[in-house]
A protein has these predicted regions:
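Activation/maturation switch segments at domain boundaries
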Residues: 1-133
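Ribonuclease/tRNase effector modules and their secretory precursors
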Residues: 107, 111-234
Length: 234
């Protein structure tokens, strides 16, 4: 029965036909027949995920933290929602995925960060395959070149010997670092090897240069992978 409040009007009139339609398992998803209610709950879960990662992105951005991971999660959540509605014949209601403070500008920045990271992920996958095949020897994870340490130390006897062997000096190292757009994060992040068309320079967190040289065949192949995946390199 329905409790009737006259000021609210008549109670909803559910017909047997409308109830049967609501409970009918007539929507197929992922190989199963689902009711409209079940589908709506699955969609709400995906909409909540989009909102969650929008809020996380805003919080990290406001704190000056790296937003790459949350941007990637947001992109995945949006894609999951879009795929779900496409598969079930539904539609995305932007009102249910709206988060205060996350507008067009924030959406564009998050999408750009996610696309850039996807390129690096794809390049790292290919580099690992080349490493396993013995095509390249360079170890580490391909990243966007970070800022170099404020002070760079070239005093190592090993580095000085390498300079002599390869005809390179401190000015070459500085030019490579300035022109570098990509690097390899090595030794659990304690060393960064900067790459550019001019060569490579490996620098520790303490600013000590551990190696320097022109691009060998492996280095050239690494840069080819960078170009292939549309990552800025010069």
């Amino acid at each position: 029965f329905f409790v009737v409040f006259p000021e609210l009007g008549s109670p909803p009139a559910w017909t047997q036909e409308s109830l049967e339609a609501l409970n009918a398992r007539d929507i197929e998803y992922n190989g199963q027949k689902c009711t409209r209610y079940e589908i709506s709950q699955m969609q709400r879960a995906r909409e909540r995920a989009v909102c969650k990662w929008k809020r996380r992105y805003l919080a990290e951005d406001a704190a000056g933290a790296d937003t790459t991971a949350s941007a990637m999660k947001l992109r995945q959540a949006r894609q999951s929602l879009a795929d779900f509605t496409r598969a079930t014949g539904g539609r995305v209601d932007s009102a249910r995925t709206s988060v205060h403070g996350f507008g067009r500008s924030e959406g564009s920045k998050a999408s750009y960060a996610a696309r850039k990271q996807e390129r690096f992920n794809a390049a790292n996958t290919e580099l690992q395959q080349m490493r396993e095949a013995g095509t390249i020897k360079a170890k580490g994870r391909l990243i966007e070149s970070p800022s170099a340490p404020n002070e760079i130390n070239f005093a190592s006897d090993h580095v000085l010997q390498r300079w002599a062997e390869r005809g390179m000096g401190p000015m070459d190292a500085e030019r490579i670092i300035r022109s570098s757009k990509v690097a390899m994060s090595q030794r659990n992040g304690t060393q960064t090897c900067y790459y550019s068309e001019l060569g490579f320079v490996a620098i520790g967190q303490d600013g000590n240069v551990s190696s320097i040289g022109p691009l060998d065949e492996g280095g050239k192949k690494l840069m080819e992978v960078v170009k292939k995946h549309g990552i800025p390199h010069s």
